[in-house]
UniProtKB/Swiss-Prot annotation:
Record GO biological process: spermatid differentiation
Bias kind Polar residues: ranges: 173-185
Residues of the signal peptide: none
Region (Disordered): 1-39, 168-188, 202-264, 340-393
Record key words, sorted: Cytoplasm, Developmental protein, Differentiation, Nucleus, Spermatogenesis
Family: Belongs to the TBATA family.
Start-end of Basic and acidic residues biased regions: 20-34, 205-227, 380-393
Name listed for the protein in its UniProt record: Protein TBATA
One protein family per Pfam: SPATIAL
Source species taxonomy: Eukaryota, Metazoa, Chordata, Craniata, Vertebrata
Keyword Nucleus tagged: yes
Quaternary context: Interacts with KIF17. Interacts with UBA3.
Function: Isoform 1 and isoform 2 may play a role in spermatid differentiation. Isoform 1 and isoform 2 regulate thymus function by modulating stromal cell proliferation via interference with the NEDD8 pathway.
The species this protein was found in: Mus musculus
Tissue and organ distribution: Expressed in the subcapsular region of the thymus and lymph node (at protein level). Highly expressed in thymic cortical stromal cells and testis. Lower levels found in brain cortex, hippocampus, kidney, cerebellum, skeletal muscle, epididymis and ovary. No expression detected in other lymphoid organs including bone marrow and spleen. Isoform 1 and isoform 2 are expressed predominantly in testis. Isoform 3, isoform 4 and isoform 5 are expressed predominantly in thymus although isoform 3 is also expressed in testis.
Length: 393
């Protein structure tokens, strides 16, 4: 029995299928960076330990084996700065699996920018410096970041959606802080109401134009031809065919002014609103449209009534008022009163004129002055022929 055990120990049992394979020299095949330092252990053919393989898969121990000289060849792992920049570094970047959302199940690379986050319940990352082959320190990120403490909206708003929120529009330092004022049309309605109240007051002040006397229609002469009419302007007869055309043209001219009047009225209303807006800027002593909008929307009624009175007086001063209708006799007497003191002053200060003054003219031939102009009255009773005969005699 002892001899059999010794034979078994010297020659282990080999399965009939497993045959010893000749040793092959390792070929210089390119390896990835993750296969660096991984050395295959010698495996006895025919004997497989599944428990050992399962444990190795569960807990992979980091191998701290020194690299062989063949690892520094070109094509294998190189610690030159070119390869560290242009190739992925599995030792320096780790990936975490995001759970809880289907659209974020892809892995997110962890970088050192996550260190700036200061959310409640977030543990700081452990950054351990390690030296490169050249002696330069390399920052290695360890995966100790917990996503359970982060709520979903804060994670999305701070980590993923890193765009800064702009509260003030770009380009206008004194922008409209209340954007509802510019979008709403309520302030425009208030301004239109205020302008209408001002215009109603000004219409009452404006003098009514004198009603033009309607000229009596000219009596047309009886038609000499059937359907023909005589025109006093041209002195010709207008045939009946052209009359229909002229009537249509007149009707068209009557229709068009109504549409034009509507456009003119709309433009006048817009001009009135602009005028009221400009006067409000002067009354409120501001050049900000936002301030005027706020005043139109939220000003008390007493303040608006006070501003309305100021607007009415300002608009009334802008309206050109006609001269008061003075009777002609009063105007004539007033001009004569102004003329008499001027004549007395000239007579007092010019004594030499008394000697050379011509004899006074009769009242009938005495010129009358309107300002500095002389007005000579021609008597209609005397004919010019009679005057010439008297002068000849």
């Amino acid at each position: 029995m002892t001899t059999e055990v010794n034979q078994l120990s010297e020659h282990p049992l080999v399965s009939p299928k497993a045959e010893p394979q000749p040793e092959t020299k390792p070929e210089n095949l390119p390896r990835s960076h993750g296969d660096v330092g991984l050395q295959k252990e010698t495996v006895v053919p025919g004997i497989v330990d599944f428990e050992l393989i399962h444990e190795e898969l569960k807990t992979t121990k980091p191998q701290t084996s020194q690299p062989t000289p063949s690892a520094y060849r070109f094509g294998r792992l190189s610690h030159h700065s070119f390869f560290s920049r242009h190739h992925p570094q599995p030792q320096r970047v780790t990936h975490i699996q995001v759970t809880g959302r289907e659209d974020l199940e892809h892995s997110l690379p962890l970088t050192t920018s996550f260190q700036l986050l200061q959310a409640p319940g977030v543990q700081p990352m452990d950054l351990t410096p390690s030296a490169d082959i050249a002696g330069k320190p390399v920052c290695v990120v360890r995966d100790e970041f917990s996503l359970s403490a982060l709520t979903q909206p804060t994670f999305l708003s701070r980590c993923l959606m890193g765009m800064p929120t702009i509260s003030v529009p770009i380009g206008d330092p004194q922008s409209n802080r209340n954007p509802q004022l510019s979008t709403s049309d309520t302030w425009r309605k208030k301004l239109k109401d205020l302008a209408s109240r001002v215009t109603v007051f000004t219409k009452e002040i404006q003098p009514k134009p004198d009603e033009q006397k309607e000229e009596p229609p000219l009596r047309e002469p009886p038609p000499r031809e059937q359907g023909a009419k005589y025109s006093a302007e041209t002195g010709r007869l207008i045939p009946a065919s052209s009359q229909a055309l002229t009537r249509r043209n007149r009707q068209g001219q009557r229709v068009h002014p109504s549409s034009k009047d509507g456009g003119v009225q709309a433009s006048i209303l817009q001009d009135q609103e602009l005028l009221i807006l400009e006067l409000l800027c002067q009354i409120l002593q501001t050049d900000s449209l936002r301030a005027i909008q706020f005043w139109l929307l939220y000003a008390p009624s007493k303040e608006k009534d006070l501003a309305l009175g100021l607007l009415q007086t300002a608009v009334a001063q802008l309206i050109p008022q006609p001269l008061s209708s003075i009777p002609a006799e009063k105007l004539w007497n007033h001009l004569q009163e102004l003329q008499e003191p001027q004549e007395t002053q000239e007579a007092a200060y010019s004594p030499s004129l008394k000697k050379t003054r011509s004899p006074p003219l009769p009242k009938t031939d005495k010129p009358e002055y309107i300002g500095k102009a002389q007005v000579l009255l021609v008597h209609p009773s005397e004919d010019p022929e009679e005057k010439t005969t008297k002068a000849e005699s």
